[in-house]
Regions:
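Conserved SAM-binding loop
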Residues: 2-86, 161-169
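S-adenosyl-L-methionine-dependent methyltransferase catalytic module, highlighting the catalytic core
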Residues: 59-66, 70-72, 76-169
Length: 170
C-alpha cells in the first residue's frame, strides 16, 4: 500500500490511499498526521509533500517516528518542505519582499477551497495552512536520519523547496 499524507485537493495518482485532516474529495482517510490508522510495517511507500512544516516543531520528531512505524523496512519516504534558510537569505538580501517571505516561511491564509470557512469546531480552515516548523537541508537530514531512515537524498527543487528521499531502516 502506497500512502500520501496531506494529499489535499490534488491527491497524487501514484498512491493508493490519500490522507488529509480535511474531508476533501478523493480523500479516503481523514486523520491527524501523527497518529495514523495503519498497522505497523503495512505501508510500502509514503509521500508527504508540504505537510511536515505544518506540524508543530515540538511534534515533528514524533510524527516522523509514527511514519516510520507504519512503513515496512526498506520502504521509501518522499518528503517535501520549504527551504526556510534559502527564503530567509533571499529576504535579507532584498531579493524578495516581506510579503513573499511571509508566504513561504509562515504559510497561513490561502484562497484555496480547502482553506475556506471553518471546521466543525469553528476554527478557520486556513489555520491548517500555517507553518509551525522551519527546515533547511541540514536540519531536515538530521531529523530524518534520527527517526529511523537511511540512504537520504536531499536536494533543492522549484528553487525554494527541499525534497528528501529516504529509506525506512531495517
Amino acid at each position: 500500500m502506497k500512502v500520501e499524507i496531506g494529499a489535499g485537493e490534488k491527491p497524487h495518482p501514484d498512491y493508493d490511499v490519500h490522507v488529509d485532516i480535511l474531508p476533501l474529495p478523493d480523500i479516503e482517510v481523514i486523520s491527524w498526521i501523527d497518529r495514523l490508522p495503519f498497522a505497523t510495517a503495512s505501508v510500502d511507500a509514503l509521500r508527504a509533500n508540504h505537510v511536515l512544516e505544518h506540524q508543530s516543531y515540538e511534534l515533528v520528531e514524533g510524527t516522523l517516528r509514527e511514519w516510520a512505524r507504519v512503513m515496512r523496512p526498506g520502504a521509501w519516504l518522499d518528503l517535501g518542505v520549504p527551504d526556510a534558510r534559502f527564503v530567509a537569505e533571499q529576504w535579507v538580501r532584498g531579493e524578495i519582499d516581506t510579503a513573499e517571505a511571509n508566504y513561504w516561511i509562515l504559510g497561513g491564509h490561502s484562497d484555496r477551497a480547502a482553506h475556506r470557512g471553518v471546521d466543525s469546531r469553528g476554527i478557520p480552515r486556513w489555520i491548517w495552512n500555517a507553518h509551525h516548523t522551519m527546515f533547511d537541508a541540514g536540519s531536515l537530514h538530521a531529523l530524518v536520519s534520527h527517526c529511523g531512515f537511511t540512504d537520504l537524498d536531499i536536494f533543492t527543487y522549484d528553487i525554494r523547496n527541499l525534497r528528501c528521499y529516504a529509506r525506512r531502516s531495517s
